[in-house]
C-alpha cells in the first residue's frame, strides 16, 4: 500500500466537499445517482447517500454539462449508464475504483477525456478496456494498485 498516494486521495476528497447538486434514487442494486446539475469544475461523488452505498450512475447523469472538468466516481460504483457523460466537452479527467466493470455504451461520447486514474486492488478486473474502446484519441491512464482509502 502506498501511504503517500492514499493520503493524496483522502485529501482530495476532503478538499472537494461533496455537493448537494445531485439527484438520486434507491434501486434493488443500491443507490443510483440519476443527475448532476451543478456547475463545479471538480466533482467528487459521494460513496454513500443516506447510509446506502452508491453503486450506479444513471444514463445521461452528467449529459451536456459544460462546467465539469474532473469527476471522482464513488469507490463502490459498479455501473455507469449509457451516455452518462454525453457531450461533457470539458471533461478532462475521470477517477474511479476497481468495482466499476460496466461502462454503458456511448458513456464518453462527445468528451475530450485526457486522463483516467484507476485505483484497484490486486487481482481485480477494471473497466479500462471499455473506456479505451470509446476513445478516438490519445489518453493518459494511471493505474494504482492498492487500497482506495
Regions found by a protein language model. Name each.
Residues 19-30, 37-55, 66-79, 89-102, ...:
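Structural signature of tandem-repeat unit edges
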Residues 2-32:
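The feature captures the LRR N-terminal capping module
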Residues 1, 10-11, 16, 85, ...:
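A subset of signal/propeptide-processing and intrinsically disordered low-complexity segments
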Amino acid at each position: 500500500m502506498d501511504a503517500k498516494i492514499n493520503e493524496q486521495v483522502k485529501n482530495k476528497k476532503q478538499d472537494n466537499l461533496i455537493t448537494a447538486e445531485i439527484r438520486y434514487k434507491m434501486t434493488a442494486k443500491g443507490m443510483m445517482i440519476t443527475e448532476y446539475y451543478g456547475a463545479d469544475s471538480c466533482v467528487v461523488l459521494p460513496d454513500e447517500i443516506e447510509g446506502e452505498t452508491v453503486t450506479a450512475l444513471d444514463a445521461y447523469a452528467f449529459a451536456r454539462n459544460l462546467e465539469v472538468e474532473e469527476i471522482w466516481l464513488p469507490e463502490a460504483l459498479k455501473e455507469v449508464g449509457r451516455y452518462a457523460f454525453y457531450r461533457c466537452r470539458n471533461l478532462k479527467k475521470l477517477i474511479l475504483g476497481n468495482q466499476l466493470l460496466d461502462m454503458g455504451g456511448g458513456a464518453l461520447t462527445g468528451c475530450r477525456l485526457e486522463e483516467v486514474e484507476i485505483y484497484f486492488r490486486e487481482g481485480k478486473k477494471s473497466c479500462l478496456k471499455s473506456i479505451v474502446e470509446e476513445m478516438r484519441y490519445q489518453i493518459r491512464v494511471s493505474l494504482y494498485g492498492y487500497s482506495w482509502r
